């Protein structure tokens, strides 16, 4: 008979249970349905989104393998950072301004450094108050480069965006609430592995790249 915590049992039949041999990854293309949310993403074919924490420094292949893999793309911005449904920070390439220099005008390409995706900063300069400040990236060290090397003097928090969307290439765009200007945040990265059998399931929709991946 069942109780308040467990279901009923049959005392005359006791099984031996079953063991799980393998968990296979299905990378085949599936039909997609719209969720009505501009920040939801899906992957057609091979590949994974890369997620982790804010402080993970990608300076080697081992560090790259330290990121978590997932194919679930329910994204949103929390406290300035792009996160998945469990609060893990999504990695990619943020927009930089002219070369590696910071400024309020985005360049035509993102940084080459794989970093946590975050919103541009909000300018406090009287001549450009509210503008999105695209923090530069030092290609040699990967460190942030702020205007005048003094972020506290020229920026205050993250820019406020609305109408945020992600296109088929992973490009994240929105509209600056303060100025009405378009803002390109950056691009979501996709990771791939040579050997799917080397991908290890951890929990829920998450995987890690093992040594054989």
Q: What do these predicted regions represent?
A:
Residues 4-129, 144, 173:
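Small-polar (Ser/Thr/Gly)-enriched, low-hydrophobicity segments
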Residues 85-213:
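Amphipathic alpha-helical assembly segments
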